[in-house]
Amino acid sequence: MEQEYHSEVFDIRRVSENDKELFREVAKAEYLFGRLYDVEPDIGLKVYWESMTEDDTEINYSVFLKNGDLLGRVALQGIDNKFPELAIIIVKQYQGQGYGELLLKEWLNWICTTMGYHRINIRIDSSNTRSIKLFQKLKAIVDREEYIIYCHLDLPME
């Protein structure tokens, strides 16, 4: 299985131990862990990093822009399931600039081609308006709505 994806905009590779300090900005931008990070940055990073790297059913990727800046993280969670779940975090410096939509279109098509997944599940906290807007743009199909919005994307994407 290919471990890296490169395009005109992104360099994406599996997360490595060398990324831990870089992931401070990712932990800060993460919707739930970011709240802990704001109070106790070192503990927030430690908990975030451990939760991300110790789960054998996740594949985590570091996303870099071509200038070398860390853009964020994308992940497949529950890879042992028929339909894995998507996680995406864009660092605050780059939020709201269209990177999330472009990243997901490129990366999810690569995931479809290299891993054979044709559907990705998504859970969004109903108060996370930024994520809701992103997945509306991507035409995510809503399966059910509660305080969590459960939806999915069919792959490949257009």
Language model features with spans:
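Conserved acetyl-CoA pyrophosphate-binding loop and the N-cap/start of the following alpha-helix
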Residues: 94, 98-106
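Conserved GNAT acetyl-CoA-binding A-motif
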Residues: 83, 113-124
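Active-site acidic-Proline motif in GNAT/NAT acetyltransferases
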Residues: 91-93, 97, 126-127
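C-terminal "cap" of GNAT-fold acetyltransferases
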Residues: 141-158
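Acetyl-CoA-dependent GNAT
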Residues: 34-85, 91, 156
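Hydrophobic adenine-recognition pocket in adenosine-nucleotide-binding enzymes
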Residues: 15, 90, 124
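Conserved active-site alpha-helix within GNAT-family acetyltransferase domains
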Residues: 101, 126-144
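A short, well-structured alpha-helix characteristic of acyl/acetyltransferase catalytic modules
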Residues: 1-49, 157-158
